[in-house]
UniProtKB/Swiss-Prot annotation:
It holds the Pfam family Pept_tRNA_hydro. It is found in: Cytoplasm. This is Peptidyl-tRNA hydrolase. The gene is pth. Its EC number is 3.1.1.29. The keyword DNA-binding does not apply. One of its GO terms (biological process) is protein quality control for misfolded or incompletely synthesized proteins. It comes from Agrobacterium fabrum (strain C58 / ATCC 33970).
Amino acid sequence: MKIIAGLGNPGAQYAGNRHNIGFMAVDALQRLPSFAPWSKKFKAEISEGEIGGEKVLLMKPLTYMNLSGESVGEAMRFFKLTPADIIAIHDELDLLAGRTRIKIGGGHGGHNGLKSLDAHCGKEYRRLRLGIGHPGDKERVHGHVLGDFAKSDRVWLDPLLDAIADNAAMLVKGDDSQLMNKLALATGSKPEAEKPVKVAKPAAQSHIHQARNSAQPKKLPETGPMAEMLKRMFGKKD
């Protein structure tokens, strides 16, 4: 069993906020045919269903962002799950809008929802980070995350949310590389590939130097006619 928790703030006034992109992603998953209507339990809106043959509990904590861990932790303990069974979907300031990353564990990076999950669930859960971009000025961050997405953002936001739902089985099974490729394809961004390792080449030699090296015998003959001739030429004595 897996818990997929979208992070956000409850209430109509926050519904369109950038900070609520985690809720939006879980809403997209809940629209899959296998999921039940939303109900309330564990201080959250929940919906049970299946993805790729595995039982999944979708959660939207009603505790507000900075107490999200209370809700998710309660469900984790109820079902006797571990942090490895939890997938948190959240907004990420440090990624360009529409870019995505996924990882296990790590720091909370100042995100209050993750900070709460760390405290109540442990740190070794998977995090699907959805980029909302940075406003460029620290003073504008609060207004940016609690501001609504612009109409122009729908160009990448809607395809991203659809792609998360369409490729939900990859999310649940941990096929992270394939999932990142699918999400990048949907938003028109390029997934970052590992940079090839540069192999050091031997220092280039001039053609003359190469010819000298190849023409020069590795060892001079010690006996025979050639040896006698060399002795006479260079005055080498026994």
